[in-house]
Amino acid sequence: MEIEVEEKEGYHIVTPVGELDVYTVPLFRKVVLKLEGYRRHDLILDLTRLTFIDSSGVGSLIEIYQKVQTVEGELAYVIDNQRILKILRLVELNKILRVFPNLGRALQDVGVTGGYVDEDFFSDLT
């Protein structure tokens, strides 16, 4: 797994590339949690370049959500992979995570809309 990190409009944007599974979660967690504790607590996890996620990967998304909530930071997820969206919907994470279809939309809406969830974005997964 490769992890790209950039700063844009006051947010750290973390983009994992490849698979987020039991083997790669430790590196992903290490990078994200280090950023979360460093300078600011506002993150966008751009998951558009993920090709696979397992239960360990989903668990890491929940853990990161909880950590950012604890410090009252902002967190958004960018996901366009229908398989990953379906997994989030099956475990009802779409009800608590702020998921956006692209980075532009996330940057536009995060921090402005509070508990924003784009329900239309998930509507075709039924």
PLM regions and their residue ranges:
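Amphipathic alpha-helical interaction surfaces in cytosolic regulatory modules
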Residues: 20-97
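Conserved catalytic submotifs in the C-terminal HATPase_c
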Residues: 8-10, 48, 104
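A charged, well-structured terminal subsegment
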Residues: 104-126
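Short beta-strand/loop segment at the start of cytosolic alpha/beta domains
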Residues: 1-15
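Long, contiguous secondary-structure blocks with strong helical propensity
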Residues: 10, 75, 79, 111-113
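Residues at or immediately preceding the N-termini of alpha-helices
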Residues: 25, 103-104
